[in-house]
A protein has these predicted regions:
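Extracellular/lumenal glycan-associated surfaces
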Residues: 18, 35, 121, 207, ...
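Active-site-adjacent scaffolding segments
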Residues: 43-136
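Short loop/beta submotifs within extracellular cysteine-rich repeat domains
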Residues: 26, 36-38, 57-59, 68-69, ...
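Vicinal oxygen chelate
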Residues: 1-8, 12-21, 50-51, 64-90, 94-143, 168-185, 193-197, ...
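Core segments of cupin and vicinal oxygen chelate
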Residues: 3, 7-10, 14-56, 93, ...
């Protein structure tokens, strides 16, 4: 079991959440697919709840907030910060557009949302009582986060300026991809890449991969539970994966990492 109880290093993907048009339906879907249980919804925070795996927090769900009914349903990825004001200033200087003003979320921490210069939206989270994921890289928990954009070079420059990312190229000319490591990190924390050749006019964005024990079985659970599969299970260098969508069309990846990953 991979658990984490402290604040995550700055720049590390530390949280993901989703606004759902029907919270109960979405909770049921992810319970069936990933085995999640849930904390009580908190009315004072818009009905927000945490998804749990054996009591550890792995993601957040909330009803669609008032005034955001037309917003796309996507999994939002939050990058850790130990000083949200300082990192917000760096993001602005590096060309980001602020989408949601920074705010305190009760005793839990502070957050804001931005779009990087390539148009990919991301959040920042400065932890207080809520430090982010307390379980990762286990079935039901987040295994990987990355950002895919038509201009990965610009994205790399931006995140290096804001968070000090260092990169290791593992892609090629047809599909550039680099692993990023945060300052002081001893292993990659995520990735930045360009779209696959057959991706068409894919929108830039951060994505999340949830770990499962058996990708093929999980894909069948997605279908049975009312979701869809846009990319059938297949092997790749680092394991086996499939691309899925949930009840609101929100896209996510299911993956089983290779034992050597």
């Amino acid at each position: 079991m991979t658990t984490h109880t402290n604040s995550w290093p700055a720049g590390t993907p530390c949280w993901v959440d989703l606004m759902a048009s029907d919270l109960e339906r979405t909770q049921t879907f992810y319970r069936d697919v990933l085995g999640w249980t849930y904390s009580e919804s908190q009315p004072e925070y818009g009905g927000y709840c945490n998804a749990l795996v054996d009591g550890d927090v792995v993601a957040g769900l909330s009803p669609t907030m008032e005034g955001m009914e037309d917003a796309p349903h996507v999994w939002s990825v939050y990058l850790a910060t130990d000083d949200i004001a300082a990192h917000a200033a760096k993001a602005g200087h590096a060309g980001a557009t602020q989408l949601l003003e920074t705010m305190e979320v009760g005793p839990f921490g502070s957050m804001g949302m931005w779009a990087d210069p390539t148009g990919a939206a991301f959040g920042m989270w400065q932890a207080n009582e809520h430090t982010g994921f307390t379980r990762v890289e286990e079935p039901g928990a987040v295994a990987w986060c990355d950002v895919m954009t038509a201009d990965p070079a610009a994205a790399r420059e931006f995140y290096a300026a804001v968070f000090g990312y260092e990169y290791q190229d593992i892609g090629d000319d047809s599909m550039p991809y680099a692993l990023f490591t945060v300052p002081g990190g001893d292993r990659p924390a995520g990735g930045i890449g360009g779209p696959a050749p057959d991706a068409g006019d894919a929108q830039p964005g951060w994505s999340v991969a949830f770990q499962v024990e058996d990708v093929d079985a999980a894909a069948e659970r997605v279908r049975r539970s009312g979701g869809s599969i846009s990319s059938e299970p297949s092997d790749f260098e680092y394991g086996r994966m499939t691309v899925a969508a949930g009840p609101d069309g929100e896209v996510f990846v299911l993956m089983t990492p290779a034992e050597t990953m």
